[in-house]
């Protein structure tokens, strides 16, 4: 009957999975190596841009109807290279952790700082001076991520790309990803990332998603 068909159509919409593709921004200049670079607004290096273009040429990045990015230059530039025809939606909460006065410093430079010792020892509520604690950082990105998922479900947007920072992606996958793993198990190089599948029932019940592939993907034979 017509009523039955409408009911099944509504159920199909409710049950439709959402896909989010996380991509870590390309590489920044090697002079920043081993430094805490969070909200410092450094651009991609020329080498980083070339590496992204090469990845884009040799491999396959997923398509989507929505593109979200951190406000920081290195993420926006990554969007311009990988998705030149899409207009990204800038979300401030997708920014990397704010390391405050520790920005631009190495662990070696900070090793005698008592606050730093507590922070590096895993104390989630310890804040760098004028920065944010790891607990604050986690709360910020979790609220943002859940808002994005809710928005995708409400608008029927099945595919989205999030271009952000390694710390953001690793933390979100450790909290919401299956198989369960620690943040550093999800570490990735610049230009790489992971795709997750969000099934509405599983999300509403347990707030979890399935990490099902690394990206970019190898090109299939004959693909340009």
Feature annotation, model-predicted:
Residues 23-86:
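Active-site-proximal alpha-helix that buttresses catalytic centers in soluble enzyme cores
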Residues 20, 156-166:
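Generic beta-sheet signal
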Residues 82-142:
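Phosphate-handling substructures
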Residues 1-14:
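N-terminal amphipathic/basic-hydrophobic helices that include classical n-h-c signal peptides
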Residues 16, 62-93, 174, 197-224:
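Conserved histidine-centered catalytic loops in small-molecule metabolism enzymes
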Residues 60-63, 148-158:
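Glycine-rich phosphate-binding loop signature in dinucleotide/nucleotide-binding domains
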Residues 179-207:
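Domain-level recognition of soluble alpha/beta enzyme cores
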Residues 69-70, 139, 163-164:
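Short beta-strand scaffold positions
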